[in-house]
Design a protein with these regions (language model features):
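Bacterial Sec-dependent N-terminal signal peptides
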Residues: 1-21
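N-terminal accessory beta-strand-rich subdomains and adjacent acidic, glycine-rich linkers
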Residues: 21-233
Length: 233
């Protein structure tokens, strides 16, 4: 049996009231994630000292209200680091996959949590709820702010019944019309020629995320949430 090397470092910090900036670096310290908690929760991703993009107003709209709530109060921040080898059940390209990241888990006073992981190759986040009974999610919100001259490559489509065979379009963000949508994966190239790829994982009993064009910026788009809202209204 092959051994698995796991290095975990954990630090728990208690916060009274509202945190302004919570920073997490990638293991190689090249990427920096800065989470801001104020009227809403936002995050900024830096490569070195250059701001790559920002994600504004991260929240779920549920039948229990917004998660996290507006002007959310931070209860605690838990930091950990992982360095291990993952052996996949089904070996495709690799029989062993190195996994190395720094994680920050923010717990709010409404008992909701946001989990952020920063790898050398990218960043991820997800919601963790602690609500009683079934939870109806009306929508998941995130506004992705890039330089308007960034080039977006994705399959533009307008139906939840998409066959995912639409041709890929290549346009500046500023050239995409408001209301247009497209599925993942989606690739963005910044003016400094950094490629940012949008992906999602571990989606179960939940609609897949698309990207849509808002008034100015890209935003998360979920077909099922909008159909439920229309039926209720």
């Amino acid at each position: 049996m092959k051994g698995v090397l796991v290095t975990v470092f954990s630090l728990l910090i208690s916060y009274m009231g509202m945190a302004k900036d919570i920073e997490t670096l990638s293991p190689d310290k090249n990427l920096k994630l800065n989470v801001s908690v104020d009227d809403d929760v936002s995050m900024q991703v830096y490569m070195g000292t250059d701001l790559l993009f920002e994600v504004k107003d991260i929240h779920l709209d549920t039948d229990h209200g917004l998660v996290p709530t507006r002007r959310a109060k931070v209860r605690s921040v838990n930091r950990s680091s992982v360095d291990r080898i993952v052996v996949p059940e089904i070996k495709e390209k690799f029989s062993e996959i190195p996994e190395k990241y720094n994680e920050t888990l923010i717990t709010f006073k409404d008992k909701s949590k946001l989990q952020f992981r920063v790898y050398n190759e990218g960043v991820v986040y997800r919601f963790i709820t602690d609500l009683e009974g079934d939870v109806v999610i009306n929508d998941e919100h995130a506004e992705f702010v890039f330089d308007q001259s960034s080039i977006l490559t994705f399959q533009q489509d307008s139906s939840m019944n998409s066959d995912y065979e639409a041709p890929y379009i290549v346009k500046n963000i500023s050239e995409i019309e408001q209301g247009k949508t497209g599925n993942l994966p989606a690739l963005l190239q910044t003016p400094s020629s950094v490629n940012v790829l949008f992906l999602e994982s571990a989606t179960e009993d939940y609609p897949c995320m698309w990207l849509g064009k808002g008034e100015e910026n890209l935003q998360a788009h979920f077909w099922l949430a909008r159909i439920v809202q229309q039926a209720v209204n």
